[in-house]
């Protein structure tokens, strides 16, 4: 239902692309429900205001000018959280002093955990947005609660299953690993990121019909209302591009010239860096597969090289018109194109949902954090992709051909199509994601404008009759 009186919601996104995109999509959803949306963002990776004329934007001084932010570091993330406290607090105070729309709440990305301190000081209700899968957060919390069970581990254990975390193995521990353990500063950061402080609820870019059992376990842990309203890129209507990088739309014209269900789309996201050896092995794996491909090689994504100069001699001549290389692509449009039959992906959560929603099966090449968990679920639980265990050209070639040409690949394509239909069903009127969105709107509308004293709201939006006891897709 739409609210009758105008209320404002302040969104505080984390600036990296994989976090910024779902927050802006959430903003579009909330705006469509009658809320005024204010985006308080860092100076780094400033969104394109012209793409979102329905929002009010406020730039916060993040104090990181001149610092290389192309790949995240703990120091930079902590500095960003500290530097943005005063700018956000001052802005919110000025908002509350002005007459006009009522400030309903602050919604913040879990990596911007400083917001909880600011909201608590001002006695404003806050809500956390989780931009990753429930399976990832569950694995993270399980390890954080008893790290001695999992860390450190021996090389001989890499392929052994993680206790209580099927289908993960020790090599899939979703933290940066150094000498077969996780440094304490990284564990401390993950504790801060997974905590919700005094926040009164959590919004999820996932679906009950995909992760019901994980969501129930996590809700028992956090004891606040959960609102799984994903996939937000589909729930948001007519969203303009949220990309920070310039998209090369000419690749769509190239796809138009390809046969239906023939092209492998290759993209490793907005942050991943690979070494030159991996690029060479990937290039020859693509070339030797004899399959048409669209390959995104982002500037700066190959250590020590810039885009095409890193490609092996003779590669472009060998593949000719069968391959197209771009610096960045309009991914949702690419995955929806009838020529695309597979996705060679890093398994970031946005890419995962976008691929499933377009019935595109995956070659899974994860690198870190949630990507490792997503890849295992995609390949072992949902069985809609094949995981690359070895980055070697013959293995890459065989995996691509298995996905694109084999009977096993046909089975994977059928499963991802079935998975899409269940997700689409959940977005219909009176179904799970749509109901959860209505509940979220009612919840925000009913929040007091000031909390005194600031305490979390306990209870369950997802009651036993609201969420299936066992999700079909998980079974």
Swiss-Prot record:
It is an enzyme of class 2 (transferase). An anthocyanidin binds at residues 19, 369. PROSITE patterns: UDPGT (PS00375). The keyword 4Fe-4S does not apply. GO terms for molecular function: abscisic acid glucosyltransferase activity; quercetin 3-O-glucosyltransferase activity; quercetin 7-O-glucosyltransferase activity. Optimum temperature is 37 degrees Celsius. The keyword Electron transport does not apply. Expressed in flowers and fruits. It catalyses: 2-cis-(+)-abscisate + UDP-alpha-D-glucose = beta-D-glucopyranosyl cis-(+)-abscisate + UDP. Belongs to the UDP-glycosyltransferase family. This is UDP-glycosyltransferase 76E1. It comes from Solanum lycopersicum (Tomato).
């Amino acid at each position: 239902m739409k609210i009758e009186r105008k209320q404002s919601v302040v969104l505080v996104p984390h600036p990296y692309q994989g976090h910024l995109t779902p927050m802006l999509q959430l903003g579009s959803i909330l705006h469509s429900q009658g809320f005024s949306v204010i985006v308080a963002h860092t100076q780094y990776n400033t969104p394109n205001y012209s793409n979102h004329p329905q929002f009010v934007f406020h730039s916060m001084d993040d104090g990181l000018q001149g610092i290389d932010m192309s790949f995240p570091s703990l120091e930079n993330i902590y500095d960003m959280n500290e530097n943005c406290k005063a700018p956000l607090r001052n802005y919110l105070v000025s908002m509350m002093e002005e007459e006009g729309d009522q400030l309903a709440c602050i919604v913040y990305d879990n990596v911007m955990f400083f917001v909880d301190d600011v909201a608590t000081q001002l006695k404003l209700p806050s809500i956390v947005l989780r931009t990753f899968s429930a399976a990832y957060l569950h694995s993270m919390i399980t390890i954080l609660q008893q790290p001695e069970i999992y860390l450190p581990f021996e090389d001989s254990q890499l392929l052994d299953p993680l206790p209580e975390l099927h289908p993960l193995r020790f090599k899939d521990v979703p933290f940066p690993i150094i000498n077969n353990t996780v440094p304490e500063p990284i564990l401390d950061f993950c504790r801060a990121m997974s905590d919700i402080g005094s926040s009164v609820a959590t919004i999820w870019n996932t679906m009950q019909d995909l992760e019901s059992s994980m969501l129930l376990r996590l809700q028992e842990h956090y004891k606040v209302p959960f609102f799984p309203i994903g996939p937000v890129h589909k729930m948001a209507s007519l969203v303009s591009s949220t990309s920070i990088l310039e998209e090369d739309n000419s690749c769509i014209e190239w796809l138009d010239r390809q046969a239906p269900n023939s092209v492998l789309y290759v993209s490793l996201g907005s942050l991943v860096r690979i070494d030159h050896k991996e690029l060479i092995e990937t290039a020859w794996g693509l070339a030797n597969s004899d399959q048409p491909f669209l390959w995104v090689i982002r500037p700066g994504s190959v250590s020590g090289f810039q885009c095409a100069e890193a490609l092996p001699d003779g590669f472009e001549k060998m593949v000719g018109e069968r391959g197209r290389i771009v610096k960045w692509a309009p991914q949702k449009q690419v995955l929806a194109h009838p020529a695309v039959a597979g996705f060679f992906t890093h398994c970031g959560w946005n890419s995962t949902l976008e691929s499933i929603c377009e019935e595109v099966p995956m070659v899974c090449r994860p690198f870190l954090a949630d990507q490792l968990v997503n890849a295992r679920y995609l390949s072992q639980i949902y069985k809609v992709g094949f995981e690359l265990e070895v980055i070697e050209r013959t293995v890459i070639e065989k995996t691509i051909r298995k996905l694109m040409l084999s009977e096993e690949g046909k089975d994977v394509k059928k499963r991802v199509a079935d998975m899409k239909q269940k997700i689409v069903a959940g977005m219909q009127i009176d179904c799970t994601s749509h109901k959860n969105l209505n509940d979220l709107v009612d919840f925000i509308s009913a929040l007091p404008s000031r909390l005194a004293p600031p305490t979390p709201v306990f209870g369950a939006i997802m009651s036993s009759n609201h969420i299936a006891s066992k999700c079909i897709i998980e079974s």
